[in-house]
Amino acid sequence: GYNLIMKLPYKTISDSLNRSRFSIILANPQNQENIGLVARAMKNTGFSELRLVGLQEFEQEAYRPAVHARDILKKAIFCQNLPEAVADLNLVLASTARQRKAFQVITIDQAVEKIRLFPSHIKVGLVFGNERTGLSDIELRQANFVYFIPQSSRQPSYNLAAAVLITLYTLFRQSAPELVAELPPPLPHKEQAGCLQIISAK
């Protein structure tokens, strides 16, 4: 009962989502360290394919924060533009930090639900924009869905790596099997109070 989560094999949770069909796409990233942190976030959540638009190679600054995720950087795919980066994908979702008049913007949870509506074998791309300017309207038109991550009005945008991590974790969390634990019925409240008195007296 209480120890159900401890008894459930880790593999059952982490392998419930076919991550190989997902591509994480960074459009014109500005900061090399952020790229390394994105790779680390991908490694933490089990995703492996990274595509980059507007870059031709990595600098050393990208490898330092990647730690054990350097293999993701070494296998990264470099693309000249966003249409090239998404050409082979069936479903594309793009992240934005603000509301856009030209687009219907949904929440990250709604975005994950959209993904789950489609067959589990299709190829999915998650697109993140430049740290300073985000994605342009032209770039957003490449997406089937545009989503945002709720945030405080005091700090209206997430760091690139944080946005990627939250997105991937949301996918991870919503794809895990539901754990239904049948707990033993609690004692009547009067008996609970009596037990607490006995424990306190020891």
Language-model features, listed with the residues they occupy:
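Post-transcriptional modification and biogenesis factors for structured RNAs
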Residues: 1-202
